[in-house]
Amino acid sequence: QGRLGTQWAVGHLM
C-alpha cells in the first residue's frame, strides 16, 4: 500500500 500512494502523488504533481 505504498506504490499506489506514490503513483497517485506523482500523477497529481505531474
UniProtKB/Swiss-Prot annotation:
The modification Methionine amide is found at M14. Keywords: Amidation, Amphibian defense peptide, Pyrrolidone carboxylic acid, Secreted. InterPro entries: Bombesin. GO terms for cellular component: extracellular region. It comes from the Eukaryota. This is Alytesin. Belongs to the bombesin/neuromedin-B/ranatensin family. Expressed by the skin glands. The modification Pyrrolidone carboxylic acid is found at Q1. It is found in: Secreted. Its main location: secreted. It holds the Pfam family Bombesin. It comes from Alytes obstetricans. GO terms for biological process: defense response; neuropeptide signaling pathway.
